[in-house]
Amino acid sequence: MQFDDVLRGRRSIRGYKSDPVPKALIKEVLGLAMRSPSSMNTQPWNFTVVSGDVLDRIRAGNTERNLAGVPHSREFRIGEAFAGQHRDRQVGVAKQLFSAMGIEREDKAGRQDWVLRGFRQFDAPVCVIITYDRVLASSDDTAFDCGAVTTALVNAAW
């Protein structure tokens, strides 16, 4: 497969088979992703690969916290609500998604279930958690570098 085919064919996956992913394949994908450029070759990323019982516990905890109304914690700021063309894109893709899933606008339970699926990593058999050393947190470059390696990871997995 050519690189332009990867980029053109990429799409967001929101449902996975439960088949285990071979460790050799995970190592290969991570090895490719780590070829990603970084500011001054800092390579600030760390990968934690979780699956099985550990991932099940993470999913259960995420679901419990969400249902209990515990506020989400984030390492990166989200900022204000989207507006203009960005909001239009956000709403447009949500309409397409919910339509494809057969979830009506008034279906609060269906929408909540969708949110919970996200907190369960859409039931993927493997989750890669990308972190960075906090000594680099003051540099905006770190966020860009982690974004670059995340993009490379997604494309390598494709």
Predicted regions and their residues:
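Acidic, surface-exposed loops and disordered segments
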Residues: M1-W158
